[in-house]
Design a protein with these regions (language model features):
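Conserved ABC transporter NBD signature motif
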Residues: 60-68, 75-76
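ABC transporter nucleotide-binding domain
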Residues: 177-261
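Short, charged/small-residue-rich alpha-helical element at the C-terminal edge
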Residues: 228-299, 303
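Conserved ABC ATPase "signature" region
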Residues: 100, 104, 111-129
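Catalytic Walker B motif of ABC-type/P-loop ATPase nucleotide-binding domains
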Residues: 158-161
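Conserved ABC ATPase signature
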Residues: 133-137
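Conserved catalytic motifs of ABC-family nucleotide-binding domains
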Residues: 154
Length: 303
């Protein structure tokens, strides 16, 4: 049975009159990809800052690998590698200089640093610009170094705050290939915030925040079943035939779409009208639809 590597219980944090985190409780299993979703201001960054020891909580408990962060902050911090949304690299320094100075804080120097650097160069493919100043790197190159910096000390948990925002598709895919490899080879836990719902759809568990509280949680499959309808697309039939089903429908290119509560209802409809459903597909709603149904907002923050 998988153990909980992060456990947050009844966490609260306010800024003056604003309740940023409101009685928040959730768990993250060791080795899983955990997605933490919410619009800007929902409480994600505050929670992450408390988890990383950068911000004091008002009340509640935060445990990393069974250890309370209040009681052994230095020990729990070493278990975490963090990639912040805004890069914390020193732009005038080269990539190697940035990583060397960071590694020294963990006591990784000399041959140990050289060995770890070479491992990260191979994993993240940055040998070509190892000696280039960070200020001269592209956004995608800089993001790779942000991740390398977070991985220097072999953390058990990698926290990724919007890791692929603004990156080209090729770099996004490279980063996710690395993350998936680390999960498989090192059983690394990944704590993700993202605006890309296709990334959240691959998570083992999802928590959706709204105004500092959990609005919904579960696996992507559970959330899609609970909050959004399936859609049946049917092709090659006339409008009179679609009307004969006595259901609401929408005209689309080359056919029609019908919303159903779930796959069971879709199957029943198709079996009962096999003569009409000779060319069709059943599609579950996506995580974008889940987020909109739960919060009334798009992840970009629009109502």
């Amino acid at each position: 049975m998988e153990s909980d590597i992060i456990k947050i219980s009844h966490l609260n944090k306010s800024f003056s009159e604003v309740k940023a985190v409101n009685d928040l409780s959730f768990r993250v299993k060791k080795g899983e990809l955990f997605a933490f979703l919410g619009v800007n201001g929902a409480g994600k960054s505050t929670t992450i800052s408390i988890l990383c020891g950068l911000l004091k909580k008002d009340s509640g408990t935060v445990q990393v690998n069974g250890i309370e962060t209040d009681k052994a902050g230095a020990q729990t911090k070493r278990m975490l590698g963090v990639v912040f949304q805004d890069s914390v690299l020193d732009k005038p320094l080269t990539v190697k200089e940035n990583l060397k100075s960071r590694a020294a804080l963990y006591g990784i120097t000399g041959n140990a640093f050289d060995k770890r650097l070479q491992e990260l160069v191979e994993i993240l493919d940055f040998d070509e610009f190892l000696n280039r100043p960070v200020g001269k790197l592209s956004g995608g190159q800089r993001r790779r170094i942000d991740i390398a910096r977070a991985l220097l000390h072999r953390p058990e948990i990698l926290i990724l705050d919007e890791p692929t925002t603004g990156l080209d598709p090729q770099t996004r895919q490279l980063i996710w290939n690395v993350i998936e490899k680390l999960q498989k080879t090192e059983n690394m836990t990944v704590f993700l915030t993202t605006h890309y719902m296709e990334e959240a759809a691959n998570a083992g568990y999802v928590v959706i925040l709204d105004k500092g509280s959990i609005a919904a949680e579960g696996t992507p499959f559970e959330l899609k079943n609970d909050y959004v309808q399936d859609i049946v697309f049917v092709y090659g039939i006339s409008e009179d035939e679609i009307k004969s089903l006595n259901r609401e429908y929408k005209k689309i290119r080359d056919g029609y779409q019908i919303k159903v509560r779930n796959t069971k209802e879709a199957t029943k409809l198709i079996v009962e009208h096999q003569d009409l459903f000779t060319d069709y597909e059943v599609v579950k709603g996506g995580m974008d639809d889940v987020f909109l149904a739960v919060t009334g907002k798009k992840l970009g923050g629009e109502r």
